[in-house]
Structures are given as structure tokens and as C-alpha cells.
């Protein structure tokens, strides 16, 4: 039953397409209660998948960023795959819900992703009033920043760290 998960699926489809990530999502949760646990669990699982796919991070660019325009919306996203989890999330939604998705759960999703992946993640809405476009732009900007951060660079022979190690 997708009731309550449509906006999340649409957002993850944007993440998949704009980050060039191979992603299939199936959510079995307690959506009849509310979407909190399902959205949070989806973020945890995605974060774990990102951590696993990143492997030892040798040759990885580590940092990625994107400023993404979508109609009247402008979103900044920056990623550091250095192993230290952190989320800086700056968004002021003007509605409590988009479809059946509580807008406060967008923060919960990205918090779960950043901590499960061990990434430093900054998402800032620079402009925008349409909550649907803001959420969609966040996921697409995150995808593009993560694609850049996890990209390989032949000039990087080990991990990109002055300490010689990444968490």
C-alpha cells in the first residue's frame, strides 16, 4: 500500500535518476499509523547502502556539492564522505504535509541517511515557496552532490585525508 509514501517514492526516483544510482525501493511499514518509522527506516537503509557501496573510499573524491534550481526553488547541498555523521538542514516549509508526507519527516529522512552513511550533509533551501518543489529539489541536489563525492579520481591513490584514514 503506497498511501502516504507517494511523495517519498517520487523523491527517491529523482535521487535515483539524477545521481545515476541503481536503486529499488520497497517499503513495508506501519503507514496506517503514520509515515515516521517508514520514512526513517528508509533513510537508515539508504545510508547503510551508501556506506557499503563506498567501500574503503580509496580514490574517491570525498566532497561533492550542488546548487540546484527547480522553477522558483533553489537548493544547496554539500556532502563530505569523511566518515563523520552530521546533518545541517535549513528549510522552512509552509505546509505541514505534501500529499500524505509530513514535511517534518524530510529532515528525519536526511538525518537517518547522514548518520547511517557516516557522511557530513548540508542541505539549505536558498529560495522557494512550493513545498513539493523544495522536497524534489532537495533529493535531486543530494543525488548530484553524492554522485560527485563518490566519484573516483585517478589522481587520488589512497583516501583523500591528511590523516591517511577515513571513518
Predicted features, each with a name:
Residues 1-167:
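Structural preference for solvent-exposed beta-strand-turn elements
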Amino acid at each position: 500500500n503506497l498511501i502516504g509514501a507517494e511523495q517519498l517514492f517520487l523523491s527517491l526516483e529523482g535521487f535515483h535518476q539524477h545521481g545515476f544510482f541503481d536503486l529499488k525501493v520497497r517499503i513495508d511499514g506501519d503507514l496506517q499509523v503514520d509515515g515516521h518509522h517508514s520514512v526513517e527506516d528508509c533513510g537508515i537503509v539508504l545510508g547503510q547502502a551508501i556506506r557499503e557501496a563506498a567501500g574503503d573510499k580509496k580514490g574517491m573524491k570525498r566532497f561533492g556539492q550542488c546548487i540546484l534550481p527547480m522553477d522558483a526553488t533553489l537548493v544547496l547541498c554539500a556532502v563530505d564522505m569523511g566518515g563523520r555523521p552530521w546533518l545541517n538542514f535549513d528549510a522552512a516549509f509552509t505546509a505541514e504535509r505534501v500529499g500524505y508526507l509530513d514535511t517534518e519527516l524530510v529532515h528525519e529522512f536526511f538525518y537517518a541517511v547522514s548518520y547511517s552513511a557516516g557522511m557530513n550533509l548540508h542541505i539549505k533551501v536558498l529560495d522557494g515557496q512550493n513545498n513539493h518543489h523544495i522536497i524534489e529539489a532537495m533529493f535531486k541536489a543530494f543525488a548530484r552532490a553524492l554522485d560527485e563525492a563518490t566519484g573516483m579520481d585517478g589522481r587520488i591513490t589512497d583516501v583523500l585525508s591528511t590523516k591517511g584514514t577515513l571513518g
